[in-house]
Amino acid sequence: MLLVLAGASGFLGTAWRDHLAREGHEVVRLVRGEALSANESSWDPYAGRVDPEVIERADVVACLSGAPLAHWPWTESYKKTFVDSRVATTRTLAEAVAASDRKPAFLAQGGVAGYGDRGDTLLTEDAPTDADTFMGSVVRAWEAATEPAAAAGARVVVMRTSVVLDRRGGPVKLLLPVFKLGLGGPVGSGRQYFSTISLRDWLRAATFLAGREESRGAYNLSGPDSTTSADFGRVFGRRVHRPAVVPVPAFVLTTLAGTVSSELLNSTRVEPARLLAEGFTFEHPTVDDRLAAALHQDPSSTGH
């Protein structure tokens, strides 16, 4: 499989690129600067420019581009950057796929914020994504940007990705020193549902969807169990041999998401219904499995 990948230098992009190479697939990275090797191709998503020959050769085009959520300060200017870095990049690639003769499959990153604060309601891919929040509006615009490819008849997959757990990036990297100091615990009340997936399972799920011709539409990339913030904090604390009773400090939330940090307190109980129905199996089905993998521990142990 030849996969053309935007966002290949980020946390998920770097890991997926390495995973695909180990699985025997070829990856061409889209880069904003000059292409320095045969497996790179220059593009300018904001000008709508991408090499049509690269798209024509691809079996799959994938977009993981996006400015990081963990940023401070969250100014109005950064909010625009956050949105454009997702929507404009996705739309440019969707239009390139639509304009191609071969019509490669198109995989686009997305999120679960569109579901909003839904308490203990189990959220499959059929649940409404009408959350009246900043992040909800971002996710809807992000998914809508794939429409040119779908309208042209290409196979389009939107990966509604929950929180990916690994110590090399994302919230685990930020929370680990907090928990090691004994300052970790639930976020907010602890009663809200907090959907997560291990990095390994995300990589496997993305590769599964890229290679499966029957897969199209939106998929929840989240672990199959339902975990509250309190459960997550308790397991995290046990994994690092520290108490986990103190609510996560506000500065951690602000560092994670700036002025939209309050949205991290939403309860979003996501179920990967379509992945499970199509036969995907999780290597890390529980939050304990996922945190053991994220911390590079033996899952049968209780910590280091």
What does each of the following model-derived ranges do?
Residues 3-23:
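N-terminal Rossmann NAD(P)H-binding glycine-rich loop of SDR-like oxidoreductase domains
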Residues 35, 39-89:
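NAD(P)H-binding glycine-rich loop region in Rossmannoid oxidoreductase-like domains
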Residues 90-132:
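Conserved Rossmann-fold NAD(P)-dependent oxidoreductase catalytic core, especially the SDR/UDP-sugar
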Residues 131-156:
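Active-site Tyr-X1-5-Lys
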Residues 140, 152-154, 165-174, 209-219:
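Glycine/proline-rich active-site loop of Rossmann-fold NAD(P)-dependent oxidoreductases
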Residues 176-184, 192-226:
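Alpha-helical substrate-binding/gating segment
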Residues 209-259, 292-304:
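Mid/C-terminal beta-alpha module of Rossmann-like enzyme folds, strongest
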Residues 262-304:
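C-terminal amphipathic/interface module of NAD(P)-dependent oxidoreductases
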